[in-house]
């Protein structure tokens, strides 16, 4: 019986014939700050069960955070071979495919949003990159503009502006605690805050102006004659 992580990975290594064989895939998962540690454990277990253990993949994870709850994340290790009735089977190469990785990211966002909604929280996450999300908002703004729904167009455009920034850098636990890491986080947060302020300023134009999506020029909203 395997009682610890060390026992698990020692056993996995013994099943491999090659000394340089890859025995695990490791990845880091960012957890929502809005959830408690217990809620994040429940969230993570549901996701791992659905995407991995139910499919014969062994998962081993540990959750880390800092004192002010600004960096909750999990380090997850999964086996490269699926479990069968007779033990470890062949290595599943499809787990390395971009399509599979995309589906894992997509479902992680889906499961997170389900938990956030269930807990009555308004925040939501997306598996898409910031650039992809921004382009979607711009397309929606153009469609709203074509439909003469200028208020909705402004809302979509404001969201696009909020998303028009580089992603916050993913820092290791060691670097997060360093002075350099904290300075980097402050710079990233400042850029994010400025984007939010710019978006807020655009939202204030609703009802008083029209923003041309293509040229991003602002025109006063003409009042209807009495």
Residue spans for each PLM region:
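Broad gene-expression machinery/nucleic-acid interaction feature
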Residues: 24-26, 56-60, 71-75
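Single-stranded nucleic-acid nicking/binding segments centered on His-rich, glycine/basic loops
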Residues: 1, 5, 13-15, 37, ...
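Active-site acidic/histidine clusters and adjacent loop/turn architecture
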Residues: 10-38, 42
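A general structural signal for short secondary-structure junctions and capping/turn motifs
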Residues: 19-20, 51, 65-69
């Amino acid at each position: 019986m395997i009682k610890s992580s060390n026992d698990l990975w020692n056993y996995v290594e013994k099943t491999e014939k090659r000394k340089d064989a890859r025995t695990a895939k490791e990845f880091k998962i960012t957890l929502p700050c809005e959830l408690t540690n217990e809620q994040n454990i429940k969230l993570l277990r549901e996701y791992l069960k659905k995407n991995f253990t139910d499919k014969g993949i062994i998962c081993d994870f540990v959750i880390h955070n800092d004192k002010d709850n600004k960096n909750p994340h999990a380090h997850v290790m999964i086996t490269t071979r699926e479990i069968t009735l007779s033990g470890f089977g062949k290595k599943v190469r499809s787990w390395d495919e971009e399509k599979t990785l995309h589906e894992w990211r997509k479902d992680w966002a889906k499961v997170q949003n389900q938990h956030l909604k269930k807990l009555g929280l308004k925040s939501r996450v997306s598996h898409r990159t910031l650039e992809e999300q921004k382009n979607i908002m711009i397309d929606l703004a153009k469609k709203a503009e074509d439909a003469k729904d200028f208020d909705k167009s402004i809302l979509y455009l404001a969201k696009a502006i909020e998303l028009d920034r580089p992603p916050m850098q993913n820092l290791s636990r060691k670097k997060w605690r360093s002075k350099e890491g904290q300075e980097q986080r402050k710079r990233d947060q400042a850029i994010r805050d400025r984007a939010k302020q710019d978006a807020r300023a655009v939202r204030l134009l609703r009802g008083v102006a029209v923003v041309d999506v293509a040229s991003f020029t602002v025109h006063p909203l003409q009042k209807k004659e009495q």
